[in-house]
Amino acid sequence: MTVAQRERAALVATFRDVPPDAPTLCEGWDVRDLTAHLVVRERRLDAAPGILIPAFADYTERVQDQVSASTDWDVLLGRVADGPPLYSPFKLLDPIANVAEMFIHHEDVRRVGPGWEPRPLDEQTVSALRRPVAMMARMTLRKAPAKVVFRTPQGDTLATAGKGPEVAVVGDPGELLMFAAGRDEARVTIDGAADLVERVKKARGGL
């Protein structure tokens, strides 16, 4: 199995262990909503653009609501477990495009409420999570009021985004990815002027 496939399987296992109306870190979405999002992203090519393009967002939301309301929970989750269909561009892009998607949304369920801890990850998974950090940071922090530098505890710089005084975000690749994706539930340390750090946090365009 690829890292993306393992992360998908882990996500599905966690989603099966909670009720579909359980909360997530995605504001306004429960687990069923999040599952419908994953299905629409991979299986409804007509609606997927609205996930990233605001002009199409209303249509995407309507399709997602329809998919969520009309599909049995086990069937909905089964479609996520099955992965992208043959006609989906994600079939070929799965090893690249879905590592971050599956990791982030799995943690969106795991990290709700107090007491969460990062999952132990093998070296292959940690390595696979390094690459998406730069892409995510460019998407969410391109207008940041600071030069935001993402570093591992070992001193490797994985991404830089924004302009201005430096703010350093330090953590393991998965934690950096969660922070870049707009989640406050990330085990990172942030070095910079306190007011600037708060402005950087608010500047993130969460996905």
Give residue ranges: language-model regions.
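An N-terminal domain-cap segment
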Residues: 1-50
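Structured surface interface patches that mediate subunit assembly and partner/cofactor docking
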Residues: 3, 17-21, 44-59, 75-207
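Generic alpha-helical scaffold signal
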Residues: 5, 25-28, 67-70, 96-99
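C-terminal end-helix/capping segment
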Residues: 57-70
